[in-house]
Amino acid sequence: MNTTRRHVSLRFFVAAALAAPLLLLAAPAPDAVGATRTCSSTTAVANRPTLRYGDTGSCVKVLQNILLGKGYSIGSSYATGTFGSGTLGAVRRYQSTKLTLVIDGVVGPTTWNRLVNGGGTTYSISSGPNTSARVILSFDDCPKSYSAFQSAVLGAKSLGVALVLAPTGNCISAGRFSPSYARANGHYVINHSISHPNLSNLSYSSVRYQLGSPGVVTSYGRPPYGSYDFTVRDAYASKGMRIWTWDVDTSDYTGRTQAQVVNHVVTYSRAGDTVLMHMGWNAFNKSAIAAMKSGLAAKGLGVCRNPGTTTPTYPKTIGC
């Protein structure tokens, strides 16, 4: 069991990401065909063409100048007019900061509108896609056994609670966690790597590997230890994924009793928070979840409601 946890604030994330140096990005599809796209900075947003990797022309320069003006690295200090890997990475990084944008590296009407006119809800790394005031109870890593997993999943469901569960791929391979079973019982399952390394110590290609099977393949992921840097962020974006960490760390992995963990959750949680716990420790059971729910209710806070079933990928917002 890994015990070290490190939280990186959203403010640091946004500020640092804007100044991120260009990193090698996943190659687009080999059949991608570029086209010459023409527009100017005075062209109405609604009339600007959709831009993709491989495109060239004056409209690409307009895009690049906007990105440079916002502090995003495009792999060059000036607009080249070629939509290459540097521009692709910058677009993805920008899209990942806006809650309602799809992270696909394509500059269509919605992305153009956000780039030019601003607006749109900023994505919170710590609270994730939760747009409600309800508290999300999340559990990482791996349960002690498959029966312990089933008991907690069914217990939370019986309480009307949806959990966010972040198992490692090794845990799934060991047969102690089933993503499909958790989803069938109304819980959200997100990526937590395959083998739980510190992703900030890995190369871009190695991070991308950790975001794939046998780990959970989905639209959100939690880097082990809450650790991420420019390389990690770009790897997530290249997979169309957003990073989701936490607001409240219970430190249950230090051996805290169930009562201590429950008290921490109730004392420190605020509206809309995501709480970090671990499936292998003392609060991954129905009685602990019930105590958290009732304790938070006494403070006027609800917990994320169980929708009955969930899907392998999740919408850009979760209302809980």
Language-model region placement:
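Secretory targeting and sorting signals
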Residues: 1-35
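Short acidic, glycine/serine/threonine-rich helix-capping segments at coil-helix boundaries
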Residues: 51-117, 167-170
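Sec-exported extracytoplasmic/periplasmic mature domains
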Residues: 65-72, 92-100, 112, 116-120, ...
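Active-site beta->alpha N-cap acidic-glycine motif
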Residues: 113-198, 206
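C-terminal domain-boundary segment and adjacent tail
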Residues: 120-129, 155-159, 172-174, 283-320
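CE4/NodB-like, metal-dependent polysaccharide N-deacetylase domain
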Residues: 154-167, 187-188, 195, 203-229, ...
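His/Asp/Glu-enriched short active-site or ligand-binding loop at hydrolase and phosphoryl-transfer sites
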Residues: 227, 232-233, 237-268, 301-312
